Every structure is written in structure tokens, then in C-alpha cells.
UniProtKB/Swiss-Prot annotation:
The keyword Glycosyltransferase does not apply. GO terms for molecular function: RNA binding. It is found in: Plastid, Chloroplast. This is Maturase K. Usually encoded in the trnK tRNA gene intron. Probably assists in splicing its own and other chloroplast group II introns. The keyword Plastid applies. GO terms for cellular component: chloroplast. Belongs to the intron maturase 2 family. MatK subfamily. HAMAP family: MatK. Keywords: Chloroplast, mRNA processing, Plastid, RNA-binding, tRNA processing.
Amino acid sequence: MEEFQGYLEIDGYQQHDFLYPLIFREYIYALAHGLNRSILLDNVGYDNKSSLLIIKRLISRMYQQNHLIISANYYKQNKFFGYNKNLYSQIISEGFAVIVEIPFSLRSVSSLEATEKEIIKSYNLRSLHSLFPFLEDKFPHLNYVSDVLIPYPIHLEILVQTLRYWVKDSSSLHLLRLFLHEYYNWNSLITPNKFIFSKSNQRLFLLLYNSHVCEYESILLFLRNQSSHLPLTSYGIFFEKIHFYEKIKYPGDEVFSNDFMVSILWFFKDPFMHYVRYQGKSILASKDTPLMMNKWKYYLVNLWQCHYYVWSQPGRIYINQLSKHSLYFLGYFASMQPNLSVVRSQMLENSFIMDNAMKKLDTLVPIIPLIVSLAKVKFCNALGHPISKSTWTDSSDFDIIDRFVRICRNISHYYSGSSRKKSLYRIKYILRLSCVKTLARKHKSTVRTFLKRLGSKLLEEFFTEEELIRSLIFPRTSYSLKKFYRGRIWYFDIFCINDLVNHE
């Protein structure tokens, strides 16, 4: 945000809510180039060609009635100063994404100044693993769960209208509307694989999609307030990647629940609804009866049909019992398992044996989807048998080992919260043997002779850092320490899902 303050003269634009002139500022695209360095198109002369004159000519031609610049036949025969259509759209979308983010960034700065100390303490809330302690704490007391996919908008005008609540500059919205209509086939952008995870123009599409999800959740929260007998505590709308600090200030938004201080009012707390979301997938869980869950299901269907013009059938939203249903979320299979224990109580000369049954959240590694992911990137075949990575044989031995070790450690790090660690041994075995086969293929040797030459040094590289520390600190002779060694650990430094983990 300091870069915005230094280069963009934000105060003047903020006062008049007028962002459109910034599209003609050359340093906007220089700033966008730095923010999008990792996802820019591979163009050698990009830095030299993205001048202010080119941008002005490009935008002026977009408003021409003959639209020569977007004609398909024109592109086949001519190129405007050596550019192609993808580069045009890339340049404008990068600059426009930075401009539209200015109002959101200003609000984030105001929240940052007010809650700077709280943000430092609550930094771990950004981790994906921070959701699982919440699930462990709340889900054993709930009865029903519904796994809901947030529908994608079927028309781009819905996204443009959503931005009107945040960006009051109509000229910028008109430019966005024209840009999306003329430069893209919108039917190819609303599909899940292309809309969110598109490599080109990723920043702009993430901004549009996040605004769509933000409005959806604000309406959902309003419906939840109307269905409750008592008002909620204060909350803030969490706008992914932009309004994160509002989440820190009001920690009851993205994962929210009804927490009332007075125990006498427990009866009025009956509509006990919890909501969790990551990307386009959300979970609704309730302590109430199936009737209340069905009521929420029709809330969602009517919301999608009436507000977002998305046709959806109630039968596609399933309501399941937590005790009988396995939930797939954030790369884990989560289910409720009974934890039986026997308690012996003695009073004077009489003793009683009581069975104590408690429910706990069981998180498992989806071993079959993981093997399928490894097979797609050529670490093993469809049956899970390790194979050599032929495309890496041109690299040095150190680079090959380092790549395999990093993949193995990242997977082990992410699945450290699994209830059963044994299922990860097969994944580690595939990666280790695939690494050995790749090195043996590079040196034109056999796996056996290569292992004899390296010995156990190669296998030690695949131990994760936490495994090495535990093996040095905790002896495995004690049952209690062994149980701790095998326990679940949630790390608060995981901010994204690895491609091998994301099987959706």
C-alpha cells in the first residue's frame, strides 16, 4: 500500500471516487508488472513495449466503432506494432486490477492502523490449517452437515454489478464491461477450471470472483441473522486477500457461530449454524433438526435463482448426518468417529464401571486421489508403481534430489494433521523410489547398484524436519510419548494448497 501512496496520489482520487484517469498513467502498468511478475506472459520485449502511448492507442481503438483491433481476420493478417490479442488483454487487465484494488487497499490500511497489535497476534488465522481446530472443537457437538458448491455467475454483468458496491466510478466499470465483452469469450471463463485458476489475467479474475463470493456471504449472513432468535455479536465481512484485516478485527466472520454469554438463554440458541468456506466450496453444519437444514437449503436455492440467475435444484444439495458421512474438505477426508473409554469409579466399598462414549473428528489422507495426482505428473503409473521422471534427467543430481525432497516434505507437512500417518508411507515410498529410478536412468545404471553406492544417505534426505526433531527428542519406548509422536499437528504457516493435494 505504501507503493500506492507514493506513486498514485491516492488522496485526490479517493476524495472524488474517480479512478478512471489512472488507466492512462504509465506507472500503473509498471507497478502492475512488479505485482504480476510471476504470471506474466512470456514476451521478451514486454518491458520496452508497454509504454503510455501504446496504452492510449489501445484504449482509443477499443472505443472505435469499427473495432478493427478485435477482428479475427485482422489478427490473422496484421499485428498492431508486433502485439497479439493476448498481450493487449494482459496489459490492460493487469493495470485495471491494480486500479480497482485501490478502494479495498485503503480500507485495509485503515483497519491495519486500528488493529496493528491484534494482527501480529492473530497472523496464524491466515493458515488453512487454522480451520481444522475449529472443526475439531465444534463438529462433535453438531448433527447434520451440508456440502455446498458456490455456483459461478452465468453472466459477466452480475460481476460488474457486484463491483458497483465497492467502486463508485462508473467510467471504470464501463471500461471493465467493454474489456470483458470484447476481449474474452465469457462462456469459456465461467467454467471452474478456467475462471479461478487461469494463468493469464489471474489477478483480475480473482478480484472479480472474490467480490462475487463476498456479496454471496453477506446475503447468507443476513439470512442467518433473520433466522436467529437473538442478534449476533459484531462481525466483519472477510473479503479474501483484500479484507483480511477485517477478519482479524472481527474474528467471527469466515468461520462463525452463535456464542451467547448468558447460559440461561441456551434454549434460544437452537438454530446453531456454522459456516466454513475455502475458495468455491462451503460447508453448513447445524445442531438442529433436518427441518432447519432443509429450510437453509431452500434459502440457498432461492438466493441463487432470484439474485444470481443460476438455476439450481434442491436435490443437488445433500443433507447428511455427521456420524454417517465422510466429508472431503481441504484435501482431507473428515468424519466423526466414536471414542470409547471405560471409567472406573469407586465410592467407599462399591465400584462402578461406566462406558464413556465421545465423538471426535477423524481426519484421513485420501490415498487414492494422491496416487492419481502423482500418476498425472509421471511419478508413478496408474497402479501406484514408481517410475522415473524422464524430464528431469537433464538436471544435476543435487537438483533432482532437492525437487523430490521438497515435494515429499510439502506433502508430509500438509498432512501432518492426519489421524493415521501410515497411509503417507506409501506416498513417501513412491517418491523415494521414483527419485532413485530417475538418478539411475540418468547415470545409465540399475536401481540396486545405485542404492549400494549411495547407501542410506539418500533416504535420510526424505525425512521431514519434524520427524528428525521428534526422533532426537522423544524415545519411542514410552507408550504416551509414542502416542504423542503419532498425534495430529496443525501448522499455521500453510497459506495455499499444493497442486498434488488439490484433487478437485
